């Protein structure tokens, strides 16, 4: 199993862009791995857990071919874990040569945000399918 951590920070990222504490200042100076984006992980190049606002940057930074990711597990709907509007770039007209659909797994609210809340009824055109996960 291949696990690639894309981000390990909390909702504000690290360093917090508004914070002047010593830890955040030191992180800015050190750069590199000391700059942490919001939480997400890729498993076996096919599964992504969560889609934060940093998803575009994470994919470009780490040279991730997001067209190969065909499963997206949404853990919850906090803004630092789900930026559903960015998924529009995977639909026809934006993404070309994508062969597999993106299967989205999550609770009712997560799926609603992906399906209706952000896309306003736009057809996914075989690009995105969703599946409800029953919670315990």
Describe each region flagged by the PLM.
Residues 1-136:
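Binuclear metal-dependent hydrolase catalytic cores
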